[in-house]
Amino acid sequence: PLCVAIILADLEMDKETIAAGLLHDVVEDTVMTLDELTKEFGLEVSFLVDGVTKLTQLNWDKDKVEIQAENLRKMFLAMAKDIRVIIVKLADRLHNMRTGQYWKPEKQKEKARETMEIYAPIADRLGISKIKIELDDLSLKFLKPEVYYDLVEKVDLRKDAREAFVQSIVDEVKAHLDEAGIEATVGGRVKHFFSIYKKMLKQNKTLDQIYDLFAVRIMVDTVKDCYAALGVIHEMYKPIPGRFKDYIAMPKQNMYQSLHTTLIGSTGQPFEIQIRTYEMHRTAEYGIAAHWKYKESGSGQVAAGKEEEKLSWLRQILEWQRDTDDSKEFLSMVKGDLDLFSDSVYCFTPSGDVKTLPSGSTPIDFAYSIHSAVGNKMVGARVNGKLVPIEYQIQNGDRIEIITSQNSKGPSRDWLKVVHSTQAKNKINQWFKTQMKEDNIIRGRDAIDRYCKA
């Protein structure tokens, strides 16, 4: 419990959350009751402890879809009541994984798989990279120990040469930024093992063929300084076309903001530079934990201000929960939404609003991301002013206009073969379920009418 509290303190959580981390096992492992805990530490702490206890008692039987789906329902409901419940649980899971060497091999794999499928993606969606990154690496360590230790050995083998190269870049960049009058902190880091492994899988390459094993990070005071620093960097090194990403203008769904650019160094070796403000760095490290403010709301707490808007994905999952009776379907939707390997594409509405969709999405996905009524009445789409087929794959920066008609009979089942987002699939399936129900009601009434007339 003390280690969990220390992790929460490192995230700079409020005193009630840290207390809940310290006490999260008390009700389950001692004779102390929840009522006694409330009298001793207050309603807020006991509410958090109770929420964490209920999550701890969940049994993630990988062979039983209904149990997994029900557990996910309970977890997301707990998050909706108070996001700090899941933050305490993430800290608890991180501590468990850190001490996982004492588990039997079967339990190591079971817990690692559960962590990789559920807890690490949730930490990612909450933007808490400090926890997410370590959970990923520890999961890889227990699931594929031979891969993990091979990576550790090979990365360590080149450590001295790599550190010397990174330091030369850091010194060179810092000198040019100083000369341009931009105050900045510049540092370098090796990418994490799971990140490297994922890149190897995605690109079907060996470690020797992965060139950007490290990144240089520049931190400045203002957004204006971010773009000024980018200008300096692009004058110093040759940028690789197609490898620039502006997450400041178009933040990720988990609040992450930075400029990413991949460059060719003076030795011909490519490397990545990330540029962000100090506030953006804090958000990248701590995510929702860096911003969460609370106001009294009955027995729990709710997010204040704009931070509540950052959890739109959670509200989406709760909507699926209400709309979906099928456990297998719900489980598939949630895991698809939390998919660690999914990349995003950023596009625009006709009014200039940014929409973030999974890579590979089509205009149908875009239509349903606006509203189910738009998707259900869609008859075509224009991308950048030109008509496109419905299976067109949206590219970054596309401006999309959906053409609708009140005469549309609704979506086609063939759309399910085309759409890429979980949200669109769910809304299309929901439309057909509603239609079937209405058709059955009409058939039933007709049958009764015929029977009465006979």
Question: Where is each model-derived feature located?
Answer:
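Short hydrophobic/aromatic-enriched beta-strand-loop microsegments
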Residues: T17, L48-V49
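Short hydrophobic/aromatic beta-strand micro-patches
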Residues: M219-D221
